[in-house]
């Protein structure tokens, strides 16, 4: 039974370069429950679809068992992904860092303007009796994984931005968000974010680079 954001909530961030797509998640969860599964318990299921969002192309699942073992399940795809999952019991947060090389998604490289259907399902289980396994979920386009593997339920990710360098200026016209279609487009040069003021969402820091957290659920 979900009792509020401290019970289970998640934030998702995307970044990319020509070689890989990177997805980071910060999950707030009062208890961590996973018996060694990539989906049944606290875990993340990734669904990838083509740009038309009518065909599921790849499925990858990730989990951290209660014994501390990393679980990577290549449900559909060649594998080759990388994952780091860490649990902090003091702050009741779990950090997922996922790397998808182009070949793991059947691509030669990632390019500006490329669109990919992506579903991120963050599963939740609890340690109370009868609450283990997949008892709830959050994420971005989670129903792409929960109710069968459904391409049309993914969100459309469009790769934009240039290599770091120059100045970044944002206005209301630069960013558009279509909630119904889950389409996010950001125009501008991805450069130094450190001096920008973020009023509603906190940057997700990875490898010394700041990445705007586009989705916060």
PLM segments and residue spans:
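Structural preference for beta-rich elements and adjacent junctions enriched in aromatics
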Residues: 1-215
